[in-house]
Amino acid sequence: ACLARRHRLPAEAVCVTNGATEAIYLTAQTFRGTNTAIVQPTFSEYADACRMHGHRVTSLYRLPAESEGYRLPEEVRMLWLCNPNNPTGTVVEKEYLATLISHNPQVCFVIDQSYEFFTLRPLFSAAEAAEFPNVLLLHSMTKRYAVPGLRLGYVTGAPHLLHRLRTNRMPWSVNQLAIEAGLHLLEHDVPDPLDVAS
């Protein structure tokens, strides 16, 4: 509920996970067997998780341009993008992503924004992304607050997608200590993360 309020989302649009890694594997499990494209080079866990759950994985080394109608390959039903990317640090602009998503309604976009507080470039807010019916945003409190042992992440998106994730999540995947620490961090956070850089 605290995360939902912070992002101005209904509680049904947020799913707390045991770090961003659980979010990755939970998403791959929920959409098992999908034709999946991963924007490369990137974090290897996306491919590992997808292969574990029977996805047919292909690599994309560039995203489609306006001259190509912003269309992804016809067989793709899920696209993984790390934004900002690990390990290159590149950022795909929000306006381009919105156009890409709108032109590919048949594709579920999994956008890992674990490093969202390491850039000043405009990215999707959770509320903006949740307006799309085919977008999941992955977030990492572990990285944001530099608490790697805490293992606390979350996914935001359209409620119907989050409902599917929750039906596959193991019970008690996030321990109470992590929850209490996460609440404390949220309650004592700088309201606007860009204030840190100013």
Role assignments for model-derived ranges:
Residues R5, Y25, Q29, D48-M52, ...:
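Short, well-ordered alpha-helices that flank and scaffold nucleotide-derived cofactor binding pockets
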Residues S67-E75, P87-R144:
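Active-site pre-lysine segment of PLP-dependent enzymes
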Residues I24-Y25, Y46-A47, T88-G89, T119-L120, ...:
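Glycine/Thr-rich phosphate-binding loops of Rossmann-like dinucleotide-binding domains
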Residues N134-S198:
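PLP-dependent aminotransferase class I/II
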